[in-house]
Curated annotation (Swiss-Prot):
Protein name: Viral late gene transcription factor 2
Family as reported in the entry's similarity comment: Belongs to the chordopoxvirinae VLTF-2 family.
InterPro entries registered for this protein in UniProt: Poxvirus_VLTF2, Znf_MYM
GO molecular function, one term: zinc ion binding
UniProt organism field: Fowlpox virus (strain NVSL) (FPV)
Length: 154
């Protein structure tokens, strides 16, 4: 299908654009010898499916959403896309995600009245095409939550 080419000690056997990753292995720690690892554990991911991992609402009445990793694994259980994307935004620097989150809410512990955020989550649960984020207005010590959607969506 493709031809093997030798270039002065460099072997190109697969074009990069069609190369498939064969393993999930990655370099975990590359440290100079003067650093010593003081904690190295392999921990299982939580298996709780009763409550939303972001807002802690009971999942019995909602269709579950989950975060999909680059390798096709599923992480978490969420009551809405808003919760899923907000949680994904918090972990995307550590876990390779299949798609970029579109919404970024801060954890509910930061809000004086988290029930106001839960109301927004519940009101927009089934709405498609939502994107947005939160900004801390430090001079007023207020969190400005701004969510938008495209005009042609429900």
């Amino acid at each position: 299908m493709y031809k093997k080419v030798n270039l002065s000690g460099i072997v190109i056997s697969e074009p990069k654009s069609v190369k498939k990753f064969k393993t999930k292995d990655s370099i975990v720690n590359v440290l100079p010898e003067y650093y010593h690892t003081i904690a190295d554990k392999r921990l299982e991911i939580r298996k709780d499916k009763d409550n939303c991992w972001f807002c802690k609402q009971d999942m019995n009445t909602y269709n579950p959403y989950f975060i999909e990793t680059l390798y096709g694994d599923h992480i978490g259980v969420f009551c809405s896309k808003i919760c899923r994307d907000s949680f994904a935004n918090m972990i995307k620097s550590v876990i390779a995600l299949r798609e970029e989150p579109k919404i970024s809410l801060l954890p509910l512990e930061l809000y004086e009245k988290p029930e106001e955020v839960l109301e927004v989550i519940n009101d927009l649960r089934h709405k498609e095409g939502i994107y947005g984020s939160c900004i801390l207005e430090s001079d007023k010590n207020i969190i400005k939550l701004t969510l938008r959607c495209h005009c042609n969506t429900n």
